[in-house]
Amino acid sequence: MLIGEYKHVVDSKGRIILPSKFREELGERFILTKGLDNCLFGYSLKEWGVLEEKLKKLPLTSKEARTFLRFFFAGACECEVDKQGRVLIPQNLREYAGIQKEVFIIGVMTRIEIWSENNWLKEMTNENLSVDRIAQKMEELGI
């Protein structure tokens, strides 16, 4: 399971060091794509396959489904972790997520999310993150 929050610096070539715990889960090669909320999603090849199977079931007759699939798959790329534990984030994905110098890499169960420092700090101060609101939502979900 991918959990935790790590802050890292993007080097001059657009690479970041993946935390070792994430490298163990993701493997030497993994899929990186545009995520929701202006971050990037990273999936192990196995998890990507599971997700792909679910997404294949979306109806092609639905404009929303086609739009989502284009967004999600057109931005996807297979990344390789080098011997130093670094991975190159392609320029188009860095631009999409607003990534410049510092990033937060977080684990969210079956995927990682890579956030620009600015977007992550905004997300963490979002009014929806109040403890009372989260507790209420957990209760509604039966958690």
UniProtKB/Swiss-Prot annotation:
One of its GO terms (biological process) is negative regulation of DNA-templated transcription initiation. GO terms for cellular component: cytoplasm; nucleoid. It is found in: Cytoplasm, Nucleoid. One of its GO terms (molecular function) is transcription cis-regulatory region binding. Its main location: cytoplasm. Residues 5-47, 76-119 form the SpoVT-AbrB domain. Transmembrane segments: none annotated. Keywords: Cytoplasm, DNA-binding, Repeat, Transcription, Transcription regulation. CDD domains: MraZ_C, MraZ_N. Pfam families: MraZ (PF02381). It comes from the Bacteria. Forms oligomers. PANTHER family: TRANSCRIPTIONAL REGULATOR MRAZ. Belongs to the MraZ family. HAMAP family: MraZ. This is Transcriptional regulator MraZ. The gene is mraZ.
